[in-house]
From Swiss-Prot:
The protein, known as: Molybdopterin synthase catalytic subunit 1
Cited PANTHER family: MOLYBDOPTERIN SYNTHASE RELATED
Any one biological process term the GO annotation gives: Mo-molybdopterin cofactor biosynthetic process
Protein source organism: Mycobacterium tuberculosis (strain ATCC 25618 / H37Rv)
One Pfam family hit: MoaE
Source taxon at top rank: Bacteria
Positions with a binding annotation for substrate: 43-45, 109-110, 125, 132-134
Top-tier EC class: transferase
Catalysed conversion reaction: 2 [molybdopterin-synthase sulfur-carrier protein]-C-terminal-Gly-aminoethanethioate + cyclic pyranopterin phosphate + H2O = molybdopterin + 2 [molybdopterin-synthase sulfur-carrier protein]-C-terminal Gly-Gly + 2 H(+)
Quaternary structure and partners: Heterotetramer of 2 MoaD subunits and 2 MoaE subunits. Also stable as homodimer. The enzyme changes between these two forms during catalysis.
Metabolic or biological pathway: Cofactor biosynthesis; molybdopterin biosynthesis
SUPFAM superfamilies: Molybdopterin synthase subunit MoaE (SSF54690)
EC number: 2.8.1.12
């Protein structure tokens, strides 16, 4: 089992410094009533804003991350009947190709599952206190706002 930095109860919500499990996220949103399941995996890419990226470092404030993610999950699930959402996010150092976030969304019908997955990642990017330091061949810098 991964070293869990923090996690919420149901719904599945995890912050960890270990590789993420797509299978765990999938299992958390699966069920006989779920006709559509969407899995989003956000990977570390080798470029950003016109320059190379060699690795990333994610820093977080775990209690606030979990509280905020649980709120986001609740809002996404409230958008349509039967929607389930699960989220796992990495912290620490990640290499190119590593999964930084895995989001699962399911619903009785595919449209609601896609909508919930998109809503979840957009709200996560806007609201969750996780900070990203980007390393390149020319140095390193924090991306976005950081307290």
């Amino acid at each position: 089992m991964a070293n869990v930095v923090a996690e919420g109860a149901y719904p599945y919500c995890r912050l960890t410094d270990q590789p993420l499990s797509v299978d765990e996220v999938l299992a958390a949103v699966s069920g006989p009533e779920q006709g559509g399941i969407v899995i989003f995996v956000g990977n570390v890419r080798d470029h950003n804003a016109g320059h190379d990226v060699t690795r990333l470092f994610y820093e977080a404030y775990p209690p606030m991350v979990i509280r905020t993610l649980m709120s986001i999950i609740g809002r996404c699930e409230d958008k349509a009947e039967g929607v389930r959402v699960a989220v796992a996010h990495r912290t620490g150092e990640l290499q190119i190709g590593d999964a930084a976030v895995v989001i699962g969304a399911s619903a009785p019908h595919r449209a609601e599952a896609f909508d919930a997955a998109r809503m979840c990642i957009e709200l996560l990017k806007q609201e969750v206190p996780i900070w990203k330091k980007e390393f390149s061949s020319t140095g390193a810098e924090w991306v976005g706002d950081r307290p």
